[in-house]
Amino acid sequence: MTITIIAPPQADAAAPAPGNRPGVAHIDPNMKLVTGTFCSASEDWFEEPLERGLRLILVQSGQLRCRIPGQPEHLIEGPSLCTIANDGDFTSAQIYGTDKPLRYTIVQLGVEALDSRLGWLPEQLIRRPGGDPRIMSCPAPRAMQALASQIATCQMLGPTRDLYLGGKALELAALSAQFLSGEGRPVEEPRITCSEVERIHAARDLLVGALQEPPSLDTLASRVGMNPRKLTAGFRKVFGASVFGYLQEYRLREAHRMLCDEEANVSTVAYRVGYSPAHFSIAFRKRYGISPSEIR
């Protein structure tokens, strides 16, 4: 696949708003990759045209609300995969959370990806001629989150970087196709009630609010009125990871954000997210493929 690189902004181009880091984009006639971080200080809805084709939006952190014609309002909170299928002239509207930056990776595929004969789109995304856009969202698997982090932290330059990112965009599209077709999902998913979902989110809030000294699984389950087995199964259903897996991923994501956005040194960041410096360096390199000192 030939990839044409969009030229970077010129020196005299308008600078992005403080805290907003638009990513580079890679395009061919049927694929585009965009990645970046967006910080919003506005609580207004923002409208933009919907591109024709299939848009795979991986929200790594942060949240937004999305409206598209003919569909109920969607709340998307990272880590999530949101998929929009559109073959008409429509507009979407978004409002972004202001409490934390939105980290995102988007792969836009052409209208050919909407062909139901490909067999990988779920029923709710199948093209209906002349119909409204279709949207669905679900927790993002860890493999997708890892890919997005590799894209965001790519250290290569020039043509090598372009080739690497183009390949990662294809890999992310393939993973999404596998996941949406059901090949990447467990055969049987645990059933949870709305009340249990609320308790699972409460457990998540307790967990991320105590990164330095997180409660044990038994304590956490007791505090939200669930048993450990049900809480673990619910975490996998809602967040795509076990309680421990989610905690580890959240710690490393927060550490990555701190290293990128704050002035703290590596040791300070490690302690703030509940690691010793030695264990932090090992876990960080395993997760992102680079040492934390390479970012700092």
Swiss-Prot record:
Signal peptide: none annotated. The keyword Transcription regulation applies. Induction: Expression is iron regulated. Residues 218-239, 266-288 bind DNA. It holds the Pfam family HTH_18. The keyword Methyltransferase does not apply. GO terms for molecular function: DNA-binding transcription activator activity; DNA-binding transcription repressor activity; transcription cis-regulatory region binding. Keywords: Activator, DNA-binding, Transcription, Transcription regulation. Residues 201-296 form the HTH araC/xylS-type domain. One of its GO terms (cellular component) is protein-DNA complex. It comes from the Bacteria. InterPro entries: Homeodomain-like_sf, HTH_AraC, HTH_AraC-typ_CS, PchR_regulatory_protein. Gene3D superfamilies: Homeodomain-like. Positive activator of the genes for pyochelin and ferripyochelin receptors. This is Regulatory protein PchR. It comes from Pseudomonas aeruginosa (strain ATCC 15692 / DSM 22644 / CIP 104116 / JCM 14847 / LMG 12228 / 1C / PRS 101 / PAO1).
